[in-house]
C-alpha cells in the first residue's frame, strides 16, 4: 500500500518543525494524515484566459476540504501568446511551457503533495501542467478556465462572428478603414476565457478529455457560463476519491500514466485530427508523451492522419463555428462518439471518473444518452455581454445541435473531408517531418509549386510581406526560428495574417522551422525538422529555389540538384550555422533554453544527452 507522500513532512517527532509550519498555514491536528492536494492555479491579470481564475483555486480547495482532503494552492506563470505575438516577447512563450512543468514539479515535490488539481487554460499552461502531471505521476485532474465567447459585430447590415485573428487581419488590411478596424478590434474578444476558436488553448483543453485527465465538458463549456462552476466543484470532490483509491486501496489505475497510455495518446491525436486542432498540439503531445515514457512519435501522427477524417471545422478554419457551437453540438464527447462509431477510437482507455472511455461516451454523448441533464448542459450558450467574470450568465440554446450531416460536428459519413484536419509531410527539406493544418487549407492549393523567398527571421518576413516583396506563387521560407534557432520557436501568426491582409492567403505557401498560432490557417507548414540551426536543409534554401508541396501524398521537396546542395552545405559548414542579417538580443535564460532544446519532431523538449 503506498504511503501518503505528505507523511514525509507530517509524521514523526523529527518533523516537528515542518508540522509547526504546516500549522501556521492553517492546518489543524486532524488534518495530519489526510492527503495534501496541490491546487495548481494559473491566475494572472495579463491573460484574458486566466483573468477570471483568481477565486477558482479556493472554490476547488473548499470542495477538497469538504471531501476529506487538505488543499494548498499555488500559482504558475502564464504567458499570453496573443499579447506576446509579433515582437521579442514571443521568444519566451514555448520556453515558458518547460518552466511551468519544472515549477509544478518543484512545488509539489518540495512539499510532498499527494495529488493535484491543475487549473489551466491558455496555450503553454495546459501543456506545461500536463508534462508535470505525467512526470510526477500522482493523482491529477485538469479543469480549465474555459473558452471565451465569440465576438459579434454588425458590418454592412449583417451580424458577423469575430475572434482575435479577425482583429489582426483587418488591422493590417490597407483596404479597411480605421473606423471598421477599430470596431472589429473592440468586438473581437468580448469576455474572459481562452480565445474563442479551435486555437491552441482550446485544442489542448479538449485533448485532456481524450487523454482521460479532465471531466466531460472541460474543453467546450464557456468560461462565462454558470454550468462551468460544477466542473470545478466536481474536480475537487473527485480528486479526493482518486487519492483514496490510490493511497488506501493501492489502485494504480488512477495515476496519470495509467490513464494517459499509448492508446490514450492515439485517441488524443485522433481527436486533434478530427477537429482540425492547432498544430501546436503536436508539439505538446510529443513532449507530454516523453514525460509519460510513452513511445508516441511523428510516425504515429502520420499513421493517424491518414485514417482519421475531419469531423468538425471551427474558427480559424471557418467563421461559421466557434467553441460555443462545439459545445452546443455535444462537445468533445460527441466528437469522440463519432470516432468510436467509425471504429477509430481505443474505447477501453480509462478516465479520472473511473470509467472506460466507452462508458463515458455512453453517458455523455448527446447522440446516445437521453439524460435531460446532459442535454441541458450542452445547451449552455453565450450571453453576448462583455465581462471578465466567470459563471456570470446562464443563457441556453433552445436545442442542442445534433445534425451530424450539416451541423458543427459531423459523422464519418458526412465528414468535412475523409482526410483529417492535420497532416505530417516529409521530404528532403524536412527529413524528420513538418506539420500542416489541412483543415485550414483551400482545396485549390493542396498541391503547390512555387519559388522560395527566404527570410532569416519573422521580423524580416513581416517587413517583406507588408513591403510588397512577397508575390503570388511564392513559398515564404522563414528559418532560424526553431527551438534552437529562435531560440524559443516563435509563432508565425502575424506573417500568415498579413498574407491574408495583402490578398495572398490563397496564393502563397509559408514554410518555417518555427511554429504557428492555433489561429493560423492557409498553406502554412511549420515545425520543419531538423531546423536550420540544427543543420536542417531549410538552412540551405536560396531565393528562387523551387519547392513542391503535395499534401494528399504527404510530400514536400526542395527541387535543387544534390550536387548544388552539397556545395551549399560545404559553404555553410565553413562559416558556421548562423542566421544572416539578423539583429536580435537574446537573454541568457533563452540561450540556456536554446542550448538544450531538441527540434520540433521531438516536441522541443530538453536534450537529456546534454546533461
UniProtKB/Swiss-Prot annotation:
GO BP annotations listed: isoleucine biosynthetic process; L-valine biosynthetic process
Cofactor entry: [2Fe-2S] cluster; Mg(2+)
Enzyme Commission code(s) on record: 4.2.1.9
Top-level taxon in the UniProt lineage: Bacteria
MF annotations from Gene Ontology: 2 iron, 2 sulfur cluster binding; dihydroxy-acid dehydratase activity; magnesium ion binding
Keyword terms, alphabetized: 2Fe-2S, Amino-acid biosynthesis, Branched-chain amino acid biosynthesis, Iron, Iron-sulfur, Lyase, Magnesium, Metal-binding
Protein residues bound to Mg(2+): 81, 123-124, 491
Active site: 517
GO cellular component: cytosol
Residues with N6-carboxylysine modification: 124
SUPFAM superfamilies: IlvD/EDD N-terminal domain-like (SSF143975), LeuD/IlvD-like (SSF52016)
Binding positions for [2Fe-2S] cluster per the UniProt entry: 122, 195
Catalytic activity of the protein: (2R)-2,3-dihydroxy-3-methylbutanoate = 3-methyl-2-oxobutanoate + H2O; (2R,3R)-2,3-dihydroxy-3-methylpentanoate = (S)-3-methyl-2-oxopentanoate + H2O
Subunit annotation: Homodimer.
Homology family: Belongs to the IlvD/Edd family.
Function: Functions in the biosynthesis of branched-chain amino acids. Catalyzes the dehydration of (2R,3R)-2,3-dihydroxy-3-methylpentanoate (2,3-dihydroxy-3-methylvalerate) into 2-oxo-3-methylpentanoate (2-oxo-3-methylvalerate) and of (2R)-2,3-dihydroxy-3-methylbutanoate (2,3-dihydroxyisovalerate) into 2-oxo-3-methylbutanoate (2-oxoisovalerate), the penultimate precursor to L-isoleucine and L-valine, respectively.
The protein's name: Dihydroxy-acid dehydratase
